[in-house]
Amino acid sequence: MLISNEWLKEYVTIDDSVSDLAERITRTGIEVDDLIDYTKDIKNLVVGFVKSKEKHPDADKLNVCQVDIGEDEPVQIVCGAPNVDAGQYVIVAKVGGRLPGGIKIKRAKLRGERSEGMICSLQEIGISSNYIPKSFESGIYVFSESQVPGTDALQALYLDDQVMEFDLTPNRADALSMIGTAYEVAALYNTKMTKPETTSNELELSANDELTVTIENEDKVPYYSARVVHDVTIEPSPIWMQARLIKAGIRPINNVVDISNYVLLEYGQPLHMFDQDAIGSQQIVVRQANEGEKMTTLDDTERELLTSDIVITNGQTPIALAGVMGGDFSEVKEQTSNIVIEGAIFDPVSIRHTSRRLNLRSESSSRFEKGIATEFVDEAVDRACYLLQTYANGKVLKDRVSSGELGAFITPIDITADKINRTIGFDLSQNDIVTIFNQLGFDTEINDDVITVLVPSRRKDITIKEDLIEEVARIYGYDDIPSTLPVFDKVTSGQLTDRQYKTRMVKEVLEGAGLDQAITYSLVSKEDATAFSMQQRQTIDLLMPMSEAHASLRQSLLPHLIEAASYNVARKNKDVKLFEIGNVFFANGEGELPDQVEYLSGILTGDYVVNQWQGKKETVDFYLAKGVVDRVSEKLNLEFSYRRADIDGLHPGRTAEILLENKVVGFIGELHPTLAADNDLKRTYVFELNFDALMAVSVGYINYQPIPRFPGMSRDIALEVDQNIPAADLLSTIHAHGGNILKDTLVFDVYQGEHLEKGKKSIAIRLNYLDTEETLTDERVSKVQAEIEAALIEQGAVIR
């Protein structure tokens, strides 16, 4: 948003320089990205009056002009502009003057004729061609009103000004208008803001006699109003208005269109002006477009509409694409006499979808997308009527034709001085706090210690108590908040917390296992929001997402990790091993904050060990991924168990839940072949753990045991079992019959194929025995081994 200092002074008076004002605004939360000085690099630029023009004797395209620049005698200037003529007031750069780009004006001879100065175009004094009126695109600028020769040309053009460029965050849509900015500045300087004139001299003829308004869907169009102005004269707008539009980055067109744009910038309320006689009926019907319906917009482009688009119609034919662009046949032309002014509130989501789909971004659509201040809708239309009466000789009909409800102008929020003081860390009196709210233009009501703040609709960023607290701190001045030393119950300076220490240990374990840490977006598409979720709970969706791919808060880290793996594989990095520790989000009831839970997730695909001279490659499989998870459990001194599970998105026969103290804390498995193929991945294994749950159980140390004094003993066993029997069931049986000498087990081979019956698999398991009190004997181990084998046979296994 470009804010002209000259224009701003119309609403609020301050003594600070523009640079000081810009610094103060930046310190309170709105970043001033640039300060544009239209007088920079310009010297000796005055108004001139062309007294005579004669053809150059030796050049067909040059003219010799005698120009009055307020001195004793006219000066002779040779000019090649096609539109120069006697009787014009023009911009003259005097000898010794300077123009943007380092151009210095000197006396010269052009084809033998003396030239003492330069008659300038707007481009030559630094105005972008994008914003120059079309009538002056290819020639010098000619003043439409009489001027005094010799006066400062920049003053005459209303360009002796400095303009602040705001870099606004989406929540501060109120600063997308001059009045919204004036409220902000008035609050910063504790001064009054003067609003512009909106009252017109109205005819006795009522607009209700000439027009009706109907809204078919008030969910999409809560309010629509129109006023009528007759007998307007289409001509250039005043110089001061053109200058303000140019400084705001808008090209002047004519007085009627310029007034529409001027009020848009002034109030932040988009308006649209129709040629009343071209509408084709006395009714305006606001509805959603019919599927396949077409209309031609002001840019002479035929648009095919969808049912999600909102259109303004004459009862049958669309005459405007609501909130985005008008239609061609109802636009204001030079012959236009009667005007219908539209002021409305449209659904922000619908406007955003339409403008994005059609690639029609405009000053109007950008404001509708962020939400309109209901308090300004009718006032902005009245302001346009006043300006049309003043600068287009219009006759304003009385009454407003409207449909729907404007909605609330204010939002009441209760707060106390104690709440504010506890949050900002120092004491302000209730009176000081109320004064700050009044500076912002917020009315207040006081009931004992409760302050009810009536927040106007223009401040859509203020919805809760904490927003009010921020406003108090901003306007009081962050720089003026007294410095205090923090008070800690327990000082941990230079020391990791227990949580930080454990998290660092886990990261080191995973990095040691060959995984790289990833950090991905918390926002996912609505389709991915519940993918792999361990809790069946409602998602948290954004009201106005920047894109469909980032519309909801995630309930799992895996969707983006899968996307990251696919991205790497597509770029020839086929061996991908990633992990992430991040937050997932689950909605609670209305008005309640969501739950934020920290998860640990990982993804592995390709080769775990690349084929090198040291040894053969090792491809990622289920047991390798499980080994990574087991390393985490060992480091945190936890004992995981595994249970077969069916989880959407994972292979039905290679998936397990991870249990801790008989509670599910995660899962591990192979990505479903279909999902893997959709992402151009080969066999891929993933795991996800509720990291908060692990941290709640984990102790901050590892229980160490002395190195055994007696040797252990290992036995291998090969089992042929039904392919649907999980290895975890077999291991559970083994440990149940292993007594106190079976210390651990390891699945080291799984085979299916030749030499085995269909539907069977072979599993090889290593059993490690140890007695810490005495040396094991073969007889003792064989006895336990026999009991284990008997139990396995009873379970249906065949000992190979």
UniProtKB/Swiss-Prot annotation:
It is found in: Cytoplasm. InterPro entries: aa-tRNA-synth_II/BPL/LPL, B3/B4_tRNA-bd, DNA-bd_dom_put_sf, Fdx_antiC-bd, Fdx_antiC-bd_sf, NA-bd_OB-fold, Phe-tRNA-ligase_IIc_bsu, Phe-tRNA-ligase_IIc_bsu_bact. It comes from the Bacteria. It is an enzyme of class 6 (ligase). Binds 2 magnesium ions per tetramer. CDD domains: PheRS_beta_core (cd00769), tRNA_bind_bactPheRS (cd02796). Its EC number is 6.1.1.20. This is Phenylalanine--tRNA ligase beta subunit.
